[in-house]
Regions:
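Small beta-barrel nucleic-acid-binding modules, primarily SNase/OB-fold domains
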Residues: 17-133
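Sec-dependent N-terminal signal peptides
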Residues: 4-14
Length: 133
């Protein structure tokens, strides 16, 4: 009986440590589709928006702040009027792209630092957002 217990524990240990063993691993989706009408809530800046992400627990997926990887934008909160004007135009263009999109997809999600938000590659109608912008 002791021998059976020892080998059972040894088997569980080896399977859990093995890179081949997938008994305890869970897979997660690598793409998330959003609807511009129902999921996108608001646009915060020229590269940041808030959306409800489906297939994620509501604690993490509802009203999630998403920053688009690769888009550099000016800050609206600046004293330089030309920079603020440029930031407003970037926000307006980004907002319109999201509103007019028929298909929005998030890929390569990465948790942001210093806050509850994520970085993502955002695809609009099959094209990565950086190429459209």
């Amino acid at each position: 009986m002791r021998r059976f217990g020892f080998f059972s524990i040894l088997f569980i240990f080896l399977v859990s440590c093995s890179s081949e063993g997938k008994f305890f691993r869970q897979s997660y989706p690598d793409k998330f589709k959003l609807s511009a009408e129902t999921d996108v809530m608001e646009t915060l800046s020229g590269n940041t928006f808030v959306a409800n992400v489906k297939n994620i627990h509501p604690v993490f997926g509802e009203a999630l702040t998403i920053k688009v990887r690769g888009l550099k934008v000016d800050s609206i909160e600046t004293e330089d009027s030309s920079s603020a004007s440029r930031a407003f135009r970037q926000w307006h263009k980004f907002s319109n792209l999201l509103k007019e999109a028929s298909d929005i997809e998030l890929r390569n999600l990465e948790r942001g630092r210093n806050g509850f938000w994520i970085w993502a590659d955002v695809y609009i109608d099959g094209e990565i957002l950086g190429d459209l912008y």
